[in-house]
């Protein structure tokens, strides 16, 4: 699924401040956003790091294109970390959500295995 958002920004607005205001995306933090982020910070024992952040570019012509980082790899000090998540809502069944994350991580693992064998 892809959503395209377009808009015009007042002159003099710093594009970095715009990005900081919209990320992490509400679809990954919950709503209301700031209360959800506070709860996540209090409940989760590990930082989400760049998970749920953005990757993209801001062009010299002030164009901007970004994607939300929901399935990610990080290679640091000879250690590869990969992450995925699920959308938990009031009617979620924890076991089903865990299975969904397992499937997503399985796809990342397969990508690693494919890269290693090629």
Residue ranges and their predicted role:
Residues 1-118:
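Conserved hydrophobic core element of enzyme catalytic domains
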């Amino acid at each position: 699924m892809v959503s395209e958002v377009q808009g015009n920004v007042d002159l003099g607005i710093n594009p970095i401040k715009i990005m900081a205001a919209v990320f992490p995306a509400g679809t990954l933090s919950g709503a209301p956003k700031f209360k959800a982020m506070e709860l996540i910070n209090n409940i989760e024992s590990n930082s989400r790091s760049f998970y749920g952040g953005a990757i993209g570019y801001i062009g010299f012509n002030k164009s901007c294109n970004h994607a939300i980082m929901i399935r990610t790899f990080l290679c640091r000090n000879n250690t590869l970390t990969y992450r995925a998540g699920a959308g938990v809502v009031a009617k979620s069944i924890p076991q089903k959500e865990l299975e969904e994350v397992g499937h997503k991580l399985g796809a990342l693992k397969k990508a690693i295995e494919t890269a290693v064998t090629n």
